[in-house]
């Protein structure tokens, strides 16, 4: 009996032993957000020194088998500081992660298929959080909201009108004629940021020769990234160097801006409603000349008219009449998010409306978004994102004008005694001193741009294999960005400058439509392997394919019948069309080696081919390499005050394909003796042109002091661009004036510094501050063609010139002796920003200053006001060295003599870019007022550009007539002035 009992117990022991052992080596728990207490799904939980790990489910729960104790578990998630926790045995371990927008332990996206801790990244990666982007005040556009918030970017507006275009340059000029703006990627979708000029305003203003090109940079178009709703964004990461952006292909030659939108979290469904109301007003006005009857008589012989207008109370400041409006602003946002065990979602609807500071101008935008994440199994995850956008913008009639017809130019020729208002019957008088009555133009013309857009994408993550030392993952991504852009331009025949008697076209109506479709597909394999001595290898390989097409059709009619707006009701009808189809494909391979987080090295190569090459199947190869050394992780490190020190170096190459049309010769249709035919263009294409090749080397250090209370980042870079694609003179006997050729090289050198200080952090009060400083210097290091001008209006006024040994953004002009000399440079001496955040109990105060030191503009607005004899400083005597001429006559004399120096001005500024003051209702008040049904209530007020300090003699040194060009920003011709904004806010969370 006793033996039977022993045998029975032994049988039960061996039966239960595996279960007992299984129960003994499990560590489980929950991961939450430290500030909100919400569960965090998708957090990586890995046993340090191995590849063994798991991810939290949609409730933030995890369960991990651990073979050996004690062990260290590493918890990491995008947007949060990583945390390491030691476990000495089977247990329940709950962990709270802190959000980290600037910490060195933040996880950042640096590859097509992988992410890395910031402390291990060998490249300078800038990050902008949702709070930094929209937390102070709602921005007009996404790209405009980035100004001054990270090092290395020069951002310039093409118009101050709501919805106007912007230019973003990272680390200087990347190309003269090719792509000069960064690639934008939203949740894995390559989005289109082209400026499409389909309006036809040049037909009226005769700017750029009155051309009707869909690529004419003077037609005041907006960048399409302006469509994106900033309130949907969770985080933005900026890859500025070729070593980081190389694997994204040739579209990323000018850098990459990676945008991650908000996601849902498991748990209670959350609803948030926010409303912002406010107004805008002009940043600065030029003012008017100090007119008197005697002065009016002296200049125009119209002293009696001045006196009569003065007696009748009809002296008007027409600048305030045009730019004196206070535009109403409303931003409404509704979001809902939540999820269950396997599925989470985020949805939002936004409606933004903003009137301009000029009557009948403004912009509106509606956005509808849905993001869904679903874990099909423990090893398969599907992510879907969709965003429908609809926008409309009315931007008036401004910028460059060769016929004195735009509102801005006409205003500069207007005297206070001129009577321009309509009579009782609605009839407008002609302008007595100009070819256009700007009040009439403002009240009846149309310049509308509307967009309907869909951005959608999906990603499938599949864990193919995993054991203690290695894993293999497959990632598939696809995205589409398609939009229809419609432009409507209408100038009725009743306008003064439309009369054929003065050379007008008897009314103009223009309808343009652009159909644009971009698609991207990619597939990756990622293999992780870790040896027993904590040496890890991450291998990734993949293929990509991008397809894009554009079809722009514009119908322009003149000689309208009774000002009929339909384009077929006219004496003359002209049709223009521009079509583009392109396909790019590539592959990449990258190997990352990590030794105990002490030394991290990366090698990679990208191969690219494009239908825009002379040989569409030819691959161009672009290597990259980087090395980061975390000195603080070595055993010899014993400086307690300096808890982190990383030294890094990186090198990379990137390509930039030829601009459209450079590889072939485009013939032009024409009537020849009454018959339809074709003629040769002025420029000869060349299918043998090579892509521009960018080679960039950067070094830097990242440091943390006093447990990262103080962090410092420093980067120095050298970016060389070879095989610049330029237009060269051609032999006249060939029949072509110019030819495309690889004919030069340029170089950018610069430095970037970032310093963040958490000065105080107590229960009731906290203060953190940040400073960013950066500068860039460019030089044309080789030029095998003759020096040439890029943008501007000739050396008599100041123009941008490409010249060997000189800056790529130099401004040249004639001196007093007629010699062409350097007069300035659009590149700033440096830029600097100051960011401060204060929190006292339930109040928060945040403000952000932006300082641009140096950099010059060609200011032609002041010259035009001189021609109109209306400049505010016309009668002052502080410009002429001889003391003989007043300022206005001196500038006109300089123009008459071809002397450009008075028109090139320092464009420095100091701006209070953003400020916000908010109050969060405390929890006890919420409980008392709403019985726990409301989770948060926030009220506040904010401002944008409310303090602007500059000596520049015009509306705003930030606004440029050629704002979207790669080289040549900083030319101003009577633009739509920029505005300051004041807002009130209410936000309620359920």
Q: What are these regions, as identified by a protein language model?
A:
Residues 282, 311-319, 327-361, 367-436, ...:
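Flexible loop and strand-edge segments within Gram-negative outer membrane beta-barrel domains
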Residues 1-12, 17-369, 374, 381-389, ...:
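Short, small/polar-rich motifs associated with maturation and membrane association
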Residues 325-341, 349-352, 438-489, 510-532, ...:
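Outer-membrane beta-barrel transmembrane strands
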Residues 357-367, 373, 387-389, 395-400, ...:
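Small-side-chain secondary-structure face that scaffolds active or pore-lining regions
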Residues 291-314, 403-440, 491-509, 549-577, ...:
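Surface-exposed loop/turn segments flanking beta-strands in extracellular/periplasmic regions
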């Amino acid at each position: 009996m006793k033996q039977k009992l022993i045998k029975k117990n032994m049988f039960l022991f061996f039966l239960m032993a595996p279960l007992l052992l299984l129960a003994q080596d499990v560590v489980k728990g929950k991961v939450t957000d430290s500030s909100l207490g919400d569960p965090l799904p998708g957090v990586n939980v890995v046993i340090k020194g191995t590849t063994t790990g798991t991810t939290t489910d949609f409730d933030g729960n995890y369960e991990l088998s651990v073979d050996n104790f004690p062990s260290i578990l590493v918890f990491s998630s995008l947007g949060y500081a990583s945390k390491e926790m030691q476990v000495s045995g089977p247990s329940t371990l709950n962990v709270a992660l802190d959000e980290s927008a600037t910490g060195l332990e933040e996880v950042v996206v640096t590859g097509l298929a992988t992410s890395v801790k910031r402390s291990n990244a060998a490249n300078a990666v800038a990050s902008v959080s949702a709070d930094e982007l929209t937390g102070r005040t709602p921005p007009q556009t996404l790209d405009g909201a980035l100004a001054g918030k990270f090092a290395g970017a020069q951002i310039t507006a093409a118009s101050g009108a709501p919805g106007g275009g912007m230019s973003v340059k990272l680390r200087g000029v990347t190309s003269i004629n090719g792509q000069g703006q960064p690639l934008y990627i939203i949740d894995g979708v390559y989005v289109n940021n082209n400026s499409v000029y389909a309006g036809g305003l040049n037909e009226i203003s005769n700017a750029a020769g009155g051309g009707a090109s869909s690529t004419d940079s003077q037609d005041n178009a907006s960048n399409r990234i302006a469509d994106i709703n900033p309130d949907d964004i969770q985080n933005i990461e900026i890859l500025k160097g070729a070593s980081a952006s190389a694997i994204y292909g040739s579209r990323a030659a000018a850098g990459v801006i990676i945008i991650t939108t908000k996601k849902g979290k498991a748990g209670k469904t959350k609803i948030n409603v926010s409303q912002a109301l406010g107004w805008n007003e002009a940043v600065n006005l030029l003012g008017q000349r100090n007119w008197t009857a005697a002065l009016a008589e002296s200049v125009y012989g119209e002293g009696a008219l001045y006196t009569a207008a003065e007696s009748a109370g009809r002296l008007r400041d027409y600048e305030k009449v045009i730019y004196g409006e206070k535009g109403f602003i409303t931003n409404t946002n509704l979001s809902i998010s939540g999820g269950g065990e396997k599925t989470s979602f985020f949805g939002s609807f936004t409606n933004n409306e903003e009137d301009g500071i000029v009557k009948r101008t403004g912009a509106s935008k509606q956005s509808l978004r849905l993001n869904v994440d679903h874990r099909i199994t423990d090893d398969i995850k599907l992510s879907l994102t969709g965003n429908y956008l609809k926008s409309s913008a009315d931007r008036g009639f401004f910028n460059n004008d060769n016929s004195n017809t735009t509102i801005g130019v006409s205003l500069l020729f207007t005297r206070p005694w001129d009577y321009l208002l309509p009579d009782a019957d609605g009839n407008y008088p002609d302008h007595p001193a100009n070819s256009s009555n700007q009040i009439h133009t403002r009240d009846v013309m149309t310049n509308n741009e509307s967009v309907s857009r869909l951005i959608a994408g999906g990603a499938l993550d599949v864990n193919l294999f995993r054991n203690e030392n290695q894993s293999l993952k497959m990632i598939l991504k696809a995205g589409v960005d398609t939009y229809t852009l419609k432009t409507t331009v209408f100038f009725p025949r009743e306008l003064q400058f439309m009369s054929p008697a003065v050379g007008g076209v008897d009314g103009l109506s223009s309808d343009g439509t652009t159909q644009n479709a971009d698609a991207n597909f990619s597939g990756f394999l990622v293999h992780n392997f870790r040896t027993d001595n904590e040496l890890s290898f991450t291998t990734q390989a993949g293929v990509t394919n991008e397809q894009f097409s554009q079809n722009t059709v514009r119908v322009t009619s003149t000689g309208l019948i009774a000002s009929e707006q339909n384009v077929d009701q006219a004496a003359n009808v002209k049709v223009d069309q521009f079509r583009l189809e392109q396909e790019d494909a590539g592959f990449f391979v990258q190997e990352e080696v990590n030794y105990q987080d002490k030394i991290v090295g990366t090698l990679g190569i990208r191969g690219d081919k494009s239908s825009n090459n002379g040989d569409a199947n030819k691959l161009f190869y672009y290597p990259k390499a980087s090395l980061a050394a975390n000195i603080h992780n070595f055993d010899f490190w014993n400086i307690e005050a300096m808890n982190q020190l990383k030294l890094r170096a990186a090198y990379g190459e990137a390509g930039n394909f030829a601009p459209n049309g450079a590889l072939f010769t485009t013939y032009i249709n024409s009537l020849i003796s009454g018959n339809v035919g074709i003629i040769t263009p002025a420029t000869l294409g060349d299918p043998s042109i090579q892509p521009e090749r960018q080679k960039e080397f950067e070094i830097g250090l990242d440091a943390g002091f006093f447990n990262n209370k103080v962090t410092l980042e420093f980067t120095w870079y050298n970016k060389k661009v070879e095989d610049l694609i330029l237009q060269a003179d051609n032999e006249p006997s060939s029949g072509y004036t110019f030819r495309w050729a690889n004919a030069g090289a340029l170089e950018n050198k610069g430095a970037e510094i970032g310093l963040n200080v958490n000065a105080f952090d107590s229960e009731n009060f906290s203060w953190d501050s940040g400073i960013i400083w950066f500068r860039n210097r460019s030089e044309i290091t080789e030029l095998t063609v003759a020096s040439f001008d890029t943008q501007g209006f000739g050396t008599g006024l100041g123009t941008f010139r490409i010249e060997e040994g000189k800056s790529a953004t130099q401004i040249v002009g004639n001196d007093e002796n007629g010699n062409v000399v350097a007069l300035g440079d659009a590149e700033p001496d440096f830029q600097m920003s100051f960011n401060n955040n204060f929190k006292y109990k339930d109040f928060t105060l945040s403000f952000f200053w932006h300082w641009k030191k140096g950099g010059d503009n060609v200011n032609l607005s002041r010259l035009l006001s001189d021609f109109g004899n209306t400049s505010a400083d016309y009668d002052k005597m502080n410009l002429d060295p001889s003391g003989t001429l007043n300022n206005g006559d001196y500038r006109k004399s300089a123009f008459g003599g071809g002397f450009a120096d008075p028109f090139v001005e320092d464009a420095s500024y100091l701006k209070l870019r953003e400020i916000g003051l908010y109050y969060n209702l405390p929890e006890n008040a919420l409980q008392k007022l709403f019985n726990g049904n409301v989770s948060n209530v926030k009220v506040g007020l904010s401002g944008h550009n409310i303090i602007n300090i500059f000596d520049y003699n015009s509306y705003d040194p930030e606004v440029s007539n050629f704002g979207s060009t790669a080289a040549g920003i900083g030319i101003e011709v009577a633009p739509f002035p920029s505005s300051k904004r004041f807002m009130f806010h209410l936000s309620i969370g359920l």
